[in-house]
Amino acid sequence: MIYQLMDNCNVIVSQSYEYDKLLELKSLRKFISILNEKLNSNFVYYIFWGEISDEQYLLSKTEKIDQSCHNILFWIGDEKGCIPSDETFQRFDFIFKVHLKDKDAIRTENGINVYRKGLYHFPLLTIDDVPELPVLSFEDRKYNLYYCGNLNKNRLPLYLSLKKKPQIKELITNFLLHNNLRGGDKLFNLCFKGKTFDFSNYYKNSYVKFYSGFNNGDNYKTYAHFLQNSKIVLSPKGFYSTECFRFYEAMRQGCIVITEELPHVECYQDAPCITVKSWKQLPDILINIDLYNTFSPSIIRKFYDDKLSINGIAQYVYNRILSI
């Protein structure tokens, strides 16, 4: 279906999704409004919510696109970060797409990925229903460490790094999954499916919980409260990508984010966060008392405002368009 978000902006939702469940719709509306203030009226925007397997649906809905305008596509929702077809590139002047991978870059310049002509990384924004709260100093925050999220297979290494004494079957599960061996999925479901794990008592003044299933943890207001009151927030990989809303929302609240390696794209360059190659590094990081001297909520929040906020992302898109 096609929905008109603004006079010069249409949202195309693939058949496997629902418009009303678009988590960042208000943010996208504000983002387009800012772009309209910066660019002239000859720009037309298309926001596509779908997987790469839905690409033909996108093409069918844009067959009669007005080629006399500058047509810009913002492709969201494809966590696998696949590269569009040549037909899509021929139809749009610029394509900004979420979750683009390092491996698909044709080269790097000054540490930033360069993709094929007309293709640019698009940051994630934040979920509309997660409230933005005042940024507190570290001294005023109750929790040293916070994580509440789904325990998917990619997050098992994080689970094991947090658990003081993992069970043998959990270690075997991780070995099988890591080496893509038969039986790993079955053992994972046996050990973890439908279960909740609370490690809050393992670490002083912390709230650390794993649950089963997407979006089954804290409600958005509670989640925002924990972000506001936490010094360190863990941001593990989702089902396919290390980029996630949690990273943006935690940075917005001035938290020290510990994340797996993010793609080499402009919005993450020099981000004031901690990047781990392996979650085995986590225990040593958590006992580092110099963390709170290295980072500050104000520095983290400033980076968010400059690079990850709606205004920051709009400025990035504007700069990319003007550079061509």
Place the predicted regions along the sequence by residue.
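Nucleotide-sugar donor-binding catalytic core of glycosyltransferases
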Residues: 1-275, 306-321
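A charged, aromatic-enriched C-terminal amphipathic alpha-helix characteristic of glycosyltransferases
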Residues: 287-324
